[in-house]
């Protein structure tokens, strides 16, 4: 995983998420106890994704393909970073993207941003746990000639397997192509967390 890309996503989270929280606090009207309870209830919603996976996929535009999917928990709870890589038969990379997922207790939802194209930080989405499934709605290709919206469902989730399915809209949600994209993932590595990029010590910042 490229360190500069990871640092960029972490800086984005540190700058953008507190500002969003400040804007939403009054409207949400939740006490600190309620916010803590929501956070504790949902901070592990994506724990099933942690670790390393091999996947097979079928897409109505690109056909059948496969690749690797890895996710790590960040130093702060309720934040997950994953990398999704599509590979060819000889191991060559055809597509690579990273997604930062962070739980927002003020809005009681997960918020996502995917980076994998020259269009910057525009592929935004939101997600919620629904029973035993995770549901996400996310935009892709924003700023390009063919933006689309995906309604994504993670289901049949187990310790070593999960299924992923998406409907797609190219007209802002007016019409949908059902089952446009399907993924089956099998675990090949255990869950893990990323080590903190910074470390506290007894010296105050700027004292060295």
Report the location of each language-model feature.
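Sec/Tat signal peptide C-region and signal peptidase I cleavage site
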Residues: 20-24
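Bacterial N-terminal signal peptides
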Residues: 7-17
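N-terminal secretory signal peptides that target proteins for export/translocation
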Residues: 1-5
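Hydrophobic small-molecule pocket/channel-lining residues, especially in calycin-type beta-barrels
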Residues: 25-208
């Amino acid at each position: 995983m490229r360190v500069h890309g990871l640092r960029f996503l972490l800086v984005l989270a540190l700058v953008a998420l507190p500002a969003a929280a400040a804007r939403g606090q009054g409207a949400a009207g939740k006490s600190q106890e309620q916010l803590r309870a929501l956070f504790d209830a949902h901070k592990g919603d994506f724990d099933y994704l942690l670790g390393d996976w091999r996947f097979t996929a079928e897409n109505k535009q690109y056909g059948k393909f496969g690749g690797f999917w890895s996710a790590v928990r960040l130093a702060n709870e309720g934040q997950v970073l994953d990398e999704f890589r599509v590979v060819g038969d000889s191991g060559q990379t055809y597509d690579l993207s990273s997604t930062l997922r962070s739980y927002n207790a003020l809005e009681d939802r997960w918020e996502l941003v995917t980076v994998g194209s020259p269009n910057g930080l525009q592929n935004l989405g939101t997600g919620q746990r629904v029973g035993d499934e995770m549901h996400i709605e996310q935009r892709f290709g924003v700023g390009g000639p063919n933006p689309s919206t995906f309604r994504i469902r993670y289901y049949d989730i187990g310790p070593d397997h999960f299924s992923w399915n998406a409907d797609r809209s190219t007209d802002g949600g007016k019409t949908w192509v059902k089952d446009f994209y399907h993924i089956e993932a099998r675990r090949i590595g255990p869950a893990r967390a990323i080590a903190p990029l910074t470390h506290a010590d007894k010296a105050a910042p700027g004292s060295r």
